[in-house]
Design a protein with these regions (language model features):
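ACP-dependent fatty acid/polyketide chain-elongation machinery
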Residues: 1-67, 247-257, 354-368, 416-420
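Flexible, low-complexity linker/loop segments at domain and module junctions
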Residues: 1-8, 95-98, 293-299, 330, ...
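Condensing-enzyme catalytic core mediating Claisen C-C bond formation in acyl metabolism
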Residues: 5-9, 36, 216-293, 302, ...
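Conserved beta-ketoacyl condensing-enzyme motif
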Residues: 8, 23, 29-164, 193-204, ...
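Acyl-CoA/ACP chain-elongation machinery
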Residues: 39, 184-230, 263-277, 307-314, ...
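Active-site-proximal alpha-helical scaffold in enzymes
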Residues: 78-91, 145, 150-153, 158-194, ...
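Phosphate/pyrophosphate-binding loops at sites that engage ATP/ADP/AMP, CoA/4′-phosphopantetheine
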Residues: 85-97, 249-256, 286-302, 324-328
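Glycine-/small-residue-rich "gating" segment that lines the acyl/pantetheine channel
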Residues: 124-133, 174, 178, 194-251, ...
Length: 420
């Protein structure tokens, strides 16, 4: 069976550095940090008092307020990015076979705010007997965003959620890619969203010592590959990619951002939350993706790394890149856009895939910000080009995006410049 080619025809993003793809791209190219004091709740007693929050989000631009009240914030973000991406793709839904359009859209955590709020209300009022919101369960569960998107458009194709912590939305893109190239769908709305900047989310990650505590200068806290890094910054938002079978896209005259070349998946099988110190899973997932794409490592121009600004993770990923790419590792560009967006958890892969695609489209690699002279880690080879502090112009024909999740889940997707 000949596999079908898959292209990207629409993009949508809600992020801490911009609502909508154009604003997101402009800000990451210019090295703008989305970090600041937490406003979603009073974090004054928490070890970490800052995050990368979405700003000025108005859900009524996407759905009416009555419907929004039935959704957790993470689902509202999902609806917003899906609507932007579908509109961007130019799909005329009324002319499409809706049985051939699917939605694969995930969340690493899901409706934690809804859960926290409802359980809190129960303990506050428990002497009155149990009383829960009738939308408690559908607001909370991590599959509901995919369901809501399909209901909104009437898409009857493959529909489910992925959940693999921070690898979630890359896995969603990978599944969408595989289903389309196997002929199971013409179009799939893929991606992920997250909204976990609430007491349980921040407190839980603080308890694991995963978050930066640089409260005096939040905008400088995410500093991947720098010696003084002390953990990641929580982010929120969503990203959506419209994946489409090539001939279907051409038949309707769609613009094509890039082609999906290959995907990889692997497991560290090492620790609940820490990366394998030698980058075993990271190495394997990149090799798997390159093999799937039938691509020589020397063809890769840019790697959007997982790069969370954690002590172990950054070292292991840099080691893995050197092992997989050999001498070519010193020729390509590497950057962590998490230095600006923070870590969007289950939405990270989709948002970083968008950054990778736009690097191909525009010939610009966004930077890894916040590296300072002398702040070098003896365990990291700085002959690698981490694109520190300033975007770099270069031709990008192939971009690879890594995402690694708690539990040892690793996912990788490779995009390439579209050519007939």
């Amino acid at each position: 069976m000949e596999l079908k080619r898959v292209v990207v025809t629409g993009l949508g993003a809600i992020t801490p550095v911009g609502n909508g793809v154009p604003e997101f791209w402009e800000n990451i190219v210019n090295g703008v940090s989305g970090a600041g004091p937490i406003t979603h709740f009073d974090a004054s007693l928490f070890k970490t008092q800052f995050a990368c929050e979405v700003k000025n989000f108005d859900v009524t631009k996407y759905i009416d307020r009555k419907e929004a009240r039935k959704m957790d914030l993470y689902t509202q973000y999902a609806i917003a990015v899906a609507k932007e991406a579908v509109a961007d793709s130019g799909l005329d839904v009324e002319k499409e076979d809706l049985n051939r359009i699917g939605v694969i859209f995930g969340a690493g955590i899901g409706g934690i705010h809804t859960f926290e709020e409802e359980v809190g209300n129960y303990y506050t009022r428990q002497e009155m007997g149990p009383k829960f919101n009738s939308f408690f369960i559908p607001k909370m569960i991590s599959d509901i965003a995919a369901g809501q998107i399909s209901i909104m458009y009437g898409f009857h194709g493959p529909n489910y959620a992925t959940c693999s912590a921070c690898a979630t939305s890359t896995n969603a893109i990978a599944d969408a890619f595989n289903l389309i190239r196997l002929g199971k769908a013409n179009v799939i709305v893929s991606g992920g969203s997250e909204a976990a900047i609430f007491p349980a989310g921040v407190g839980g990650f603080n308890a694991m010592h995963a978050l930066s505590t640089r409260n005096d200068e939040p905008e400088k806290a995410s500093r991947p590959f720098s010696a003084s890094r002390d953990g990641f910054i929580m982010g929120e938002g969503g990203g959506c990619l419209i994946l489409e079978e090539l001939e279907h896209a051409k038949a309707r005259g769609a613009k094509i951002y890039a082609e999906v070349a290959g995907v990889g998946m692997s497991a560290d099988a090492h620790h609940l939350t820490a990366s394998h110190p030698e980058g075993l899973g990271a190495k394997l997932v990149m090799m798997n993706a390159l093999e799937d794409a039938e691509m020589d490592p020397k063809e890769v121009d840019y790697i959007n790394v997982h790069g969370t600004s954690t002590p172990v993770g950054d070292i292991s990923e840099a080691k893995a890149i050197k092992e997989v790419f050999g001498d070519h590792a010193f020729e390509l560009n590497i950057s962590s856009t998490k230095s600006m967006t923070g870590h969007l958890l289950g939405a990270a892969g989709a948002v970083e895939s968008i950054a990778s695609i736009l690097a191909i489209k525009n010939g610009i690699v966004p930077p890894t910000i916040n590296h300072e002279e002398g702040d070098d880690d003896e365990n990291i080879d700085y002959n690698l080009n981490f694109t520190f502090n300033k975007a770099q112009k270069r031709e990008v024909n192939v971009a690879l995006s890594n995402t690694f999740g708690f539990g040892g889940h690793n996912a990788c997707v490779i995009f390439k410049k579209y050519a007939e």
